[in-house]
Amino acid sequence: MEPNDSWRVDSEFRYTLFPIFYSIIFVLGVIANSYVLWVFARVYPSKKLNEIKIFMLNLTMADLLFLVTLPLWIIYYYHEGNWILPKFLCNLAGCFFFINTYCSVSFLAVITYNRFQAVTRPIKTAQATTRKRGISLSLIIWVAMVAAASYFFVLDSTNIELSKTGAGNLTRCFEHYEKGSMPVLIIHIFLVFSFFLVFLVILFCNLVIIRTLLTQSVQMQRNAEVKRRALWMVCTVLAVFIICFVPHHIVQLPWTLAELGFQSGNFHQAINDAHQITLCLLSTNCVLDPIIYCFLTKKFRKHLSEKFYSLRGSRKCSRVTTETGTEVVVPLSQVPVNSLKK
């Protein structure tokens, strides 16, 4: 493959930003999502998973798919945008990036709609058997996203660029668009408008949930706690969308136009810089998604609280020195209360 003209702009700060940021996301994301899977396996028998827990489990799997490719991107940006790995791994990384992004959007959307039904039609929702629907919707989402992402797996994903330092050529991964390519533009227009259509539906559902919860009279303290958690859940889902997905899709279309040669100069450089930042924000959904689970399931919160207090308790074990000078560990429950006061 011959090197192409170096007409495209570059944002060189990304070669420092992405390795650091993606490393943090990788560590936090793997820990958080692996813990979620462990809790699901330990607390919830597979046959007792209801619709929303099925969606949560699938969302976790989508996040882990993206996380396993982060080391590939870390290596890529560490080498200043030079893909030194086998070409098929570039295709795989791009494929999993697409699957994670739009599976996450889809599963957050159906989770929101599930909560919308629970608030607006509580009796009907409580009586409905939703396990089969959860499995069916999950299969539809996965099949649709994998089918769409297969395009990136067969695409010629790499291209050769001349290094700006003149030290040789760089192999780029998913960083080349043919000037004026209308198919590429149409695909991006479809993705961006589809996202904002889904976002508007989610925004509407969440606003209805908030209004309904705020207008309900609270007669018991327990109900007040349930309402508080429900409101936090709504705010968390909206925060994930606004922080992670909205900035990327706002920038995506003008960035595509600039990459295709419809815009140039200072605008192209500015929008390319902004695009790199939105890619970082997009990856944070892998860390933020597990927070939603804390507000959605009672058992998950209980298990997390028990582990947290268990760790605190083990750290607070009192060390008492006997008269003989031998140090022994005494459980906290057996230490007099007055001895713990400092």
From Swiss-Prot:
Membrane-traversing stretches: 17-38, 55-74, 92-113, 134-155, 185-205, 234-254, 277-296
BP-aspect Gene Ontology terms: chemotaxis; G protein-coupled receptor signaling pathway
Record function comment: Receptor for platelet activating factor, a chemotactic phospholipid mediator that possesses potent inflammatory, smooth-muscle contractile and hypotensive activity. Seems to mediate its action via a G protein that activates a phosphatidylinositol-calcium second messenger system. May have a role in peri-implantation development during pregnancy.
Xref: InterPro entries: GPCR_Rhodpsn, GPCR_Rhodpsn_7TM, PAF_rcpt
Stretches assigned to the Cytoplasmic side: 39-54, 114-133, 206-233, 297-342
Extracellular topological domain: 1-16, 75-91, 156-184, 255-276
GO molecular function: G protein-coupled purinergic nucleotide receptor activity; platelet activating factor receptor activity
Intracellular or extracellular location(s): Cell membrane
GO cellular component: membrane; plasma membrane
Disulphide-bonded residues: 90-173
Tissue specificity statement from the Swiss-Prot or TrEMBL entry: Differentially expressed in the lung, heart, liver, skeletal muscle, kidney, spleen, small intestine, endometrium and white blood cells. Expression levels are higher in the endometrium of pregnant compared to non-pregnant individuals. Endometrial and embryonic expression levels increase from day 10 to day 16 of pregnancy.
Organism encoding this protein: Sus scrofa (Pig)
Name of the protein: Platelet-activating factor receptor
Gene: PTAFR
